[in-house]
């Protein structure tokens, strides 16, 4: 893996072991189990030693209504497979039922996804990390009052709203094969967020993302859409991504970046029609890292789950500036990766319908739009008091050397590059059979959820402190 030499970044990684238990239903292409596979693979590559691992706080309904409508979130909290008949009109109104089915633990799944992304943004705001990773996030199709494209709560919008408390300008980059419509819609009329999406366009879900969709009002020219055809390969993708993102960075001058790393743009994806390899996909991560800005990396689409796990493991390694071998280590889901048991995939022989002339024409049109931007728009920032969330740094010094350290403390420790000893816990964990999904329990009462949250969340992410912080910055959020 060829990486640019330089100062290594501090990386924080958010993961909840329960996320793999949620199940959209038989035959549904969205499989949260892919997040567990990714986690297990990067553990067995030893990447956990080089980053801080956190279990995210579950986002509350109040957190979600920073963007989503109250009645929509109330509906998501209430709906269950056993009471769907009572909500038939609301299911139709909120677009829940087919692509976005009702399943056991739906709201808790949304809480984990959104909680990880918002917590990642808080970490970046507090300058406690350079890169924050939440592969459970990136659900870019969800709208203010509507589920869409397997997405219910738009964790990306919630995370960007959090970043805007401390950053004047945030750029959102989407390399999922599908247009990032939900995020674009949320920020379509503001000049504080630029949305940049590289996606398949033309008789393809969600049908938006035309080159001519450029934003409106104050947000005019702050939406960038690179509409692509079938079969784009690594070489063509790199040839458009780097110049477009260089121009965006030059003209917009963001102080934070959100990168949605949807893996359905890979070759061989169950729902995709692009021809990128994992290395080609990861070149986007490598390039964005070179701008040395606070970076939030999120998941997204990806429906050939063995390749999703490969991709996001490799991109975690890229974030860490770590070289990992192509030979996959043995892991709990090793049989999924046969017959080759390698990390990297080969492109197919599909035709690249994106001619050089077509790509150049689109690129020049986008450059014309970007030239219409005023350089680095100004914004009046309100002073925000220091967060009251506690910092856990220094905890290691308080450990009793005669006692075994907790899993939580162990996760927070980052090993030096020269440290090769194996953890005594290495190799423990998950199941091998994806078919044996554990059914999660009913949606719990508010009192039960609050009790669980207090146990699960790290000191720095307690619900009490987050609520205090959200009230203090409410006016700033509303102004976006």
From Swiss-Prot:
Residues of the active site: 141
E.C. no: 3.5.1.98, 3.5.1.-
Enzyme class, first EC level, given as a word: hydrolase
Localisation: Nucleus; Cytoplasm
Assembly and oligomerization: Part of a large multiprotein complex that also contains RBBP4.
Pfam families: Hist_deacetyl (PF00850)
Compositional bias (Basic and acidic residues): 401-416, 443-480
Stated role: Histone deacetylase that catalyzes the deacetylation of lysine residues on the N-terminal part of the core histones (H2A, H2B, H3 and H4). Histone deacetylation gives a tag for epigenetic repression and plays an important role in transcriptional regulation, cell cycle progression and developmental events. Histone deacetylases act via the formation of large multiprotein complexes. Also functions as deacetylase for non-histone proteins.
Keyword Hydrolase: yes
Organism: Xenopus laevis (African clawed frog)
Biological process according to GO: heterochromatin formation
Protein name, UniProt field: Probable histone deacetylase 1-A
């Amino acid at each position: 893996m060829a990486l640019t030499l330089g100062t290594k970044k501090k990386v924080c990684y958010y993961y909840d072991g329960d996320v793999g238990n949620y199940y959209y239903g038989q035959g549904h292409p969205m499989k949260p189990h892919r997040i567990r596979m990714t986690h297990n693979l990067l553990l067995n590559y030893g990447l956990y030693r080089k980053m801080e691992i956190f279990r995210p706080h579950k986002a509350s309904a109040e957190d979600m209504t920073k963007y989503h409508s109250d009645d929509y979130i109330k509906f998501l909290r209430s709906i269950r497979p056993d009471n769907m008949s009572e909500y038939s009109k609301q299911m139709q109104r909120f677009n829940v039922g087919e692509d976005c089915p009702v399943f056991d633990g739906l709201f808790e799944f949304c809480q984990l996804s959104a909680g990880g992304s918002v917590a990642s943004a808080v970490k970046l705001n507090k300058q406690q990390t350079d890169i924050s990773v939440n592969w459970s996030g990136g659900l870019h199709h969800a709208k203010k009052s509507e589920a869409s494209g397997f997405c219910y709560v738009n964790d990306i919008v919630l995370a960007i709203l959090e970043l805007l408390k401390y950053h004047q300008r945030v750029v959102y980059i989407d390399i999922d094969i599908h247009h990032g419509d939900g995020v674009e819609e949320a920020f379509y009329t503001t000049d504080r967020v630029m949305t940049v999406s590289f996606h398949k366009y033309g008789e393809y879900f969600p049908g938006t993302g035309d080159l001519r969709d450029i934003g409106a009002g104050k947000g005019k020219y702050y939406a960038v859409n690179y509409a692509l055809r079938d079969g784009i390969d690594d070489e063509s993708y790199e040839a458009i991504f780097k110049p477009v993102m260089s121009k965006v960075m030059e003209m917009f001058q963001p102080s934070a970046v959100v990168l949605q790393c949807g893996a359905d743009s890979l070759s061989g994806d169950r729902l995709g029609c692009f021809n990128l390899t994992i290395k080609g996909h990861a070149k986007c991560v490598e390039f964005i890292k070179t701008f040395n800005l606070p970076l939030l990396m999120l998941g997204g689409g990806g429906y050939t789950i063995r390749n999703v796990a490969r991709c996001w493991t490799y991109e975690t390694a890229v974030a860490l500036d770590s070289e990992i071998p192509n030979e996959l280590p043995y892991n709990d889901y090793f049989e999924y990766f046969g017959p080759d048991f390698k990390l990297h995939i080969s492109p197919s022989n599909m035709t690249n319908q994106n001619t050089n002339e077509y790509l150049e024409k689109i690129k020049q049109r986008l450059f014309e739009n970007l030239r219409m931007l005023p350089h680095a728009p100004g914004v009046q920032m309100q002073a925000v008091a220091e967060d009251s969330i506690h910092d856990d740094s220094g905890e290691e010094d308080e450990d009793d050397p005669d006692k075994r350290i907790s899993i939580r403390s162990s996760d927070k420790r980052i090993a030096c590059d020269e440290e090769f000893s194996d953890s005594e816990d290495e190799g423990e964990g998950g199941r091998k059979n994806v078919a044996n999904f554990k059914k999660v329990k009913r949606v719990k009462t508010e009192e039960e959820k609050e009790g669980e949250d207090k146990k699960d969340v790290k000191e720095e992410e307690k619900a009490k402190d987050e609520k205090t912080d959200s009230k203090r910055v409410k006016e700033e959020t509303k102004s976006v």
